[in-house]
A protein has these predicted regions:
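Register position in tetratricopeptide repeats
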Residues: 15-16, 49-50, 83, 116-117
Length: 122
């Protein structure tokens, strides 16, 4: 229960623009639970917004290593790859998720975009 509260607190801090405090919250959560996919995903979002792409890739990858079908991390990782003009790298991951969840329109759209990438800076 404590970990859920810490995760929620971090998400509230982030939503209120207190990014550094949110980051500390998520990092402390990982000290208690190194398998918290949500914390890794949230840290990936923070790194992505800070334009620390290497760190963002690392965090999203760690989240997906814990749960390869974690939708939030898949969407965030795909958006990061799009911003780096490397969207085709997401195809295998998106195909797998799309096969398992045929009703997910956002994943289908991301997969279509990955197969027909447009430059990020158009």
């Amino acid at each position: 229960m404590k970990m859920k509260n810490t995760l929620s607190n971090g998400e509230v801090l982030f939503a209120n623009g207190k990014v550094e405090e949110a980051e500390k919250c998520f990092l402390s959560l990982l000290e208690d639970d190194a398998e918290c996919k949500e914390a890794y995903n949230n840290l990936g979002v923070i790194a992505f917004q800070s334009e620390d792409n290497e760190k963002a890739i690392d965090y999203f990858t760690r989240s997906l290593e814990i749960d390869p079908l974690y939708r939030d991390a898949i969407v965030n990782y795909t958006n990061l790859l799009r911003s780096l003009d490397q969207l085709p790298l997401a195809i295998p991951l998106l195909e797998k998720v799309s096969e398992l969840n045929t009703e997910d329109k956002e994943i289908k759209q991301l997969l279509d975009d990955s197969r027909n990438p447009q430059p990020a800076n158009v």
